[in-house]
Amino acid sequence: MLKVSNISFQYTPKKEILTDISFTLGEGQHLCVMGESGSGKSTLLKAVYGLLDLKKGSIYWKNEEVLGPAFHLVPGVSFFKYVAQDFDLMPFTSVAENIGKFLSRFYPEEKEQRTNELLEVIEMSSFANEKVKTLSGGQQQRVAIARALAKEPELILLDEPFGQIDNFKKNSLRRKLFSYLKEKNISCIVATHDGDDALSFADQMMVIKNKKVVALDSPRNLYKNPSEHYVAALFDDVNELFIDEKKRLIYPHQIQVSIDSSYKAIVKKSFFKGSFWLIEAMFNSQVIFFENPENIDLGKEISLSFID
């Protein structure tokens, strides 16, 4: 189990990056850390990996304290793996050689088998002999993830792991990677901007705002019962409305066109989204967004209903 207790960190005396962060993570569990740029997500991963000397607090993995550079000649925990946004690959060697870099040469068959297994996970078997320098940024990102998994870690830390990967490839890769981690009982912490990384794959989701934790729960609970606009907006567009004198956070799919309702709105714009239209409208002098199966004429007055 990973136990993070009240950790704080600052690069300079006047610039605190993390403030009183606490959470636990069980073996084989996945935590998604979300927040806007500059909120401290990447710094948290570095702290957990042991790359930083904390201002206060402690980090333990299975009763062993994780200490920073002041205590280690080579910082970082040997049985953790950290995949940063700069991949640190060997550009003039092949994809397979990069993945197998830290595997023993004394067991070539096992090394080849392990490398091929991970090439399947990242969907790059056909690129095994390609030089890394010829790959796109997204492909290099996938190679970096596979290399981190080659010597199976107990905990893997992924910083925006799908940030450079094409959308058409991202969903398939996510399913394969997170299923593989579950199968191998590898704990995982992902720092991301993408709510899809959390909703389908994380056991817990942490939201950081202004260097502090503002929400920590299952992704399902945070999606259905967001504590504030900031949390809801990490998943989707969100409308903050006063309905029956009560403030509500309402996603676009929770607003429907009604045959007859006292809630009226004027359509201003529409955006085709494939399986539906996203409609922008004025409601009580406020811009709102809602989903509709068909386009609606601009300027048309419509009646709306709100669902839970």
Descriptions of predicted regions:
Residues 210-211:
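Conserved ABC ATPase "signature" C-loop
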Residues 131-135, 139-141:
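Conserved ABC ATPase signature
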Residues 66-81, 105:
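ABC ATPase NBD coupling module
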Residues 150-154:
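A short, proline-enriched helix->beta-strand linker immediately N-terminal to the Walker B motif
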Residues 247-308:
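Non-catalytic connector elements of ABC transporters
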Residues 110-127, 179:
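Conserved ABC ATPase "signature" region
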